[in-house]
């Protein structure tokens, strides 16, 4: 499907009844071709989506609410366009269902069909809301480094290694900003880079992250671009790139890519989420 047909950036009426046809898949392969990624990916990964505005009607018409975390595997053929996902979830608002399991079943079925692969789902009932925590990404934050930069489109040539023996460390920043490729709206994120290899020059990494500031690309694609650029520039033996983007339309998106870890860390939202 062409992005010109996506609901993002268009005036779309909110649905009054359940409609799985609202989901708009976007092939991952299109963007990956521009990153020189083929069928064999250099990473494993997952896109964690947190839904904060999930509601439906029970069999007697009483509203119910919940939260949910969806896990889209990075090797699924498609991502789901975010506004279409929001509209789809809102289509349950006036839909009567016999129980929460009926909602789960529809969500799992519809999202798997859109993504082209099974999608993990954790359902969070109101009884568990008090258990949810906030935390910042682990790592050494590089935001206070004194840098000067006037480049605001991705500039992988800024990346460089520092002298020294191989290290194993985790670096983090809250200064990642990219933009929606359809609407131009800003997308804000915290970024974590965990690696083992030659030391990455921290000031160079911060400049590189800041260079995304006027770049227009979906969250998932930005993280894969960052992963590839770091691999080419510094060739770490192990690398994980993880971004937690701020919420929009009741959804936040948190792409995670790694060539050595089997699963992302606990899905704990940051203060800005």
Swiss-Prot record:
Keywords: Cytoplasm, NADP, Oxidoreductase, Queuosine biosynthesis
Positions annotated to bind substrate: 80-82, 219-220
Catalytic activity: 7-aminomethyl-7-carbaguanine + 2 NADP(+) = 7-cyano-7-deazaguanine + 2 NADPH + 3 H(+)
Pathways per UniProt: tRNA modification; tRNA-queuosine biosynthesis
GO MF term (any one): preQ1 synthase activity
Cellular localization per UniProt: Cytoplasm
Catalytic residues of the enzyme: 180, 187
HAMAP family according to UniProt: QueF_type2
NCBIfam families: QueF (TIGR03138)
Family statement drawn from the similarity comment of this UniProt entry: Belongs to the GTP cyclohydrolase I family. QueF type 2 subfamily.
Complex and partners: Homodimer.
Role played: Catalyzes the NADPH-dependent reduction of 7-cyano-7-deazaguanine (preQ0) to 7-aminomethyl-7-deazaguanine (preQ1).
Protein name, UniProt field: NADPH-dependent 7-cyano-7-deazaguanine reductase
Organism ancestry: Bacteria, Pseudomonadati, Pseudomonadota, Betaproteobacteria, Burkholderiales
